[in-house]
């Protein structure tokens, strides 16, 4: 909930994450000063799972133990628990996307988990690609659908892979000091040489780079960062000229 004066308890312009390894909770700001919090966790089979939160006492114990700072802000969480039913996350991966006069678009073709926030954008991209192909092929719908499916299917698959990968980042890696150092190095190098390095998140979220291309470039960047992280004393020399020059050599094939 909001503060008594209606202000936000924490930064309204940030995604807030409580990473816990196998699960996590996130919070996003609402316009009234409150936050919508979502708990992503296995339904069953884990030490911490939804099937174990089956009473007000178990809910309170869980949040007191696992998210004590959240519980301090929302001590009434158990009272609201049953008003927020569980739902499932799913991926739809299918082929072909077209048949006769029918074409799948948006979630019908490539529904994905929400951890990159790109589901709607991907649907709009489908529309843009299809619109351009309609202009290219005029009324030849067979050619339109054939090229649409051939062009978009790899991007739909890549977005799903990216979204799943980012779930692991959010629930686990963001609390890993080595991972955070990798991101600091990437950000520093990208600031110095924006044409040689665009972080994967920026490729996906803030550019028109195809998801399939971003996914492959992200893999190459990860391999480069594995090499950089092996530099002796990297935690103390991460922003040095030596490290930046090594990054420049390793990223010579990139041109953003």
Describe each region flagged by the PLM.
Residues 87-104, 157, 179:
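FAD-binding beta-loop-beta segment adjacent to the flavin cofactor pocket
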Residues 31, 63, 126, 152-155:
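Hydrophobic/aromatic residues within well-ordered alpha-helical segments
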Residues 24, 89-93, 109-121, 154:
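Glycine-rich phosphate/pyrophosphate-binding beta-alpha loops
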């Amino acid at each position: 909930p909001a503060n008594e004066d209606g202000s936000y308890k924490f930064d309204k312009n940030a995604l807030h994450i409580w990473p816990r390894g196998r699960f996590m909770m996130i919070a996003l700001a609402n316009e009234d000063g409150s936050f919508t919090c979502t708990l992503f966790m296995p339904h069953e089979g884990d030490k911490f799972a939804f099937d174990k939160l089956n009473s007000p006492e178990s809910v309170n114990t869980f949040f007191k133990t696992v998210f004590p700072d959240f519980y301090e802000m929302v001590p009434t969480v158990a009272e609201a628990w049953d008003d927020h039913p569980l739902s499932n996350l799913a991926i739809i991966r299918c082929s072909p996307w077209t048949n006769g006069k029918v074409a799948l678009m948006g979630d019908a073709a490539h529904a994905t988990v929400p951890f990159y926030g790109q589901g709607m954008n991907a649907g709009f991209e489908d529309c843009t690609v299809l619109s351009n192909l309609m202009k290219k092929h005029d009324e030849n719908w067979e050619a339109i659908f054939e090229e649409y499916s051939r062009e978009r299917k790899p991007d739909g698959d890549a977005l799903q892979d990216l979204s799943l990968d980012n779930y692991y980042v959010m629930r686990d890696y963001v609390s890993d000091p080595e991972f955070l150092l990798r991101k600091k190095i990437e950000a520093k190098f990208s600031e110095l040489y924006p044409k040689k390095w665009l972080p994967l998140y920026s490729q996906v979220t803030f550019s028109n780079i195809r998801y399939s291309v971003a996914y492959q470039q992200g893999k190459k960047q990860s391999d480069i960062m594995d090499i950089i992280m092996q530099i002796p004393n990297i935690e103390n020399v991460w922003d040095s000229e030596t490290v930046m020059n090594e990054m420049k050599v390793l990223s010579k094939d990139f041109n953003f």
